[in-house]
Amino acid sequence: MRSEWVARRRGQANVTQMHFARQGVITEEMDYVARRENLPPELIRSEVARGRMIIPANINHTNLEPMCIGIASRCKVNANIGASPSSSGLAEELEKLKLAIKYGADTVMDLSTGGGDLDEIRTAIIQASPVPIGTVPIYQALESVHGNVEKLSAEDILHIIEKQAQQGVDYMTIHAGILIEYLPLVRNRLTGIVSRGGGILARWMLAHHKQNPLYTHFRDIIEIFKKYDVSFSLGDALRPGCLHDASDEAQMAELKTLGQLTRMAWEHDVQVMVEGPGHVPMDQIEFNVRKQMEECDEAPFYVLGPLVTDIAAGYDHISSAIGAALAGWYGAAMLCYVTPKEHLGLPNAEDVRNGLIAYKIAAHAADIARHRPGARDRDDEMSRARYNFDWNRQFELSLDPERAREYHDETLPADIYKTAEFCSMCGPKFCPMQTKMDAEALSELERFLAKQPTA
């Protein structure tokens, strides 16, 4: 779809959506996004120019259907997939991608660390995906030196970043905010550093006693991103991995640096979103969102959960969806899903489904609470279908139509029950929605009440 759009921009030194937006140009991607969001194209352009919205759209991902991430638009959901050395491979990851898109993922991150040729896996995912694809390039950089952190060089990392940009990756998690002087701040944490990318860079800094190479070479990364329109997803390497560590000095120190890096990228018209925690008690979620907006000048906030309790192993998609709904309400622009397997293992296809649906619920609830245009239309349509006992319409309107139909049909599978004025919960005699309050009956009641003596 985008081949012709992109062809007209080739040869320019800076092809980012932010660059065009700041020149007053409404690109085809902005116009497409405006129609998807039911928002004016000029609003999309101004939000992208301001840095409050991004359109992750690598010029080499031509089969992409453009979307946006920002507070002016619907709250988005990301699904993580990716092969590991001990589980999964290309076929399984393509199946997860298909499921993620089916159940509403707005973007997908390929976090593969093994399971085959990483370039082959990533290229296949990009070619098969109509949604933006994100990566964490430090993973492949480490794999390129066979897991030996000490041998990793800045040149190795930059080479991988450029290669992934050429392949069509739309946004990359760059953990440039974890500085060597921040490492002692984790001393009193219960769970230390829980970011994989952060852990890799921390080990590198401890081994070499040198500053984070992603920080010292940040301008080099900017130059790569300008050429392909790759968006920064500034990684929170020092995010809290448990409630005890939430909102601590290490997290806040890194956040301040992420704000500085955001402004540096903006100086070159490169798009940025900022990643956030993690594990946060409910009473600290609003503070975390407000603090990010303050430090990062309202760059879109992309949060992992956050989980609101640490004891829900096997059910962390529920624990985190609670936090995600609150974060979305307070202003987070995208929610990274958590599956039931979080902290326990690599998610399978069913875990992807359960995690995504939990997060689609959270994002939709946030959209309703923020009064986004048309956010509640589907809910009202569902309510009408329920009141009219239109079971097939209820299934269609559900976030997971197959699951809704499956649960209904467990006890009432025959077609005749698709028009029945009851379900198996109340049965035919006790459903309160059978009590229809028609206008004539209510008018008659009002006339009767009007005749009654007042107390």
UniProtKB/Swiss-Prot annotation:
Quote the record's cofactor note: Binds 1 [4Fe-4S] cluster per subunit. The cluster is coordinated with 3 cysteines and an exchangeable S-adenosyl-L-methionine.
Q: Which InterPro entries match?
A: ThiC, ThiC/Bza_core_dom, ThiC/BzaA/B
UniProt record, GO biological process: thiamine biosynthetic process; thiamine diphosphate biosynthetic process
**Which positions does UniProt annotate for substrate binding?**
N80, M109, Y139, H175, S195, R196, G197, D236, A237, L238, R239, E275, Y302
Catalytic function, reaction form: 5-amino-1-(5-phospho-beta-D-ribosyl)imidazole + S-adenosyl-L-methionine = 4-amino-2-methyl-5-(phosphooxymethyl)pyrimidine + CO + 5'-deoxyadenosine + formate + L-methionine + 3 H(+)
**What's a Pfam family in this record?**
ThiC_Rad_SAM
This protein's pathway: Cofactor biosynthesis; thiamine diphosphate biosynthesis
Sorted keywords for this record are: 4Fe-4S, Iron, Iron-sulfur, Lyase, Metal-binding, S-adenosyl-L-methionine, Thiamine biosynthesis, Zinc
Binding positions for [4Fe-4S] cluster per the UniProt entry: C423, C426, C431
Q: Where does Zn(2+) bind?
A: H279, H343
What Gene Ontology cellular component terms go with this record? cytosol
Cofactor requirement: [4Fe-4S] cluster
EC number(s) per UniProt?
4.1.99.17
Highest taxon, organism lineage: Bacteria
Query: Its Gene Ontology molecular function terms?
Result: 4 iron, 4 sulfur cluster binding; carbon-carbon lyase activity; zinc ion binding
Cited function: Catalyzes the synthesis of the hydroxymethylpyrimidine phosphate (HMP-P) moiety of thiamine from aminoimidazole ribotide (AIR) in a radical S-adenosyl-L-methionine (SAM)-dependent reaction.
Under the heading PANTHER family, the entry gives: PHOSPHOMETHYLPYRIMIDINE SYNTHASE, CHLOROPLASTIC (PTHR30557:SF1), THIAMINE BIOSYNTHESIS PROTEIN THIC (PTHR30557)
| Family membership noted in the UniProt record | Belongs to the ThiC family.
Name-wise, this protein is Phosphomethylpyrimidine synthase
Q: Which species is listed as the source?
A: Synechococcus sp. (strain JA-3-3Ab) (Cyanobacteria bacterium Yellowstone A-Prime)
The gene that this protein is the product of is thiC
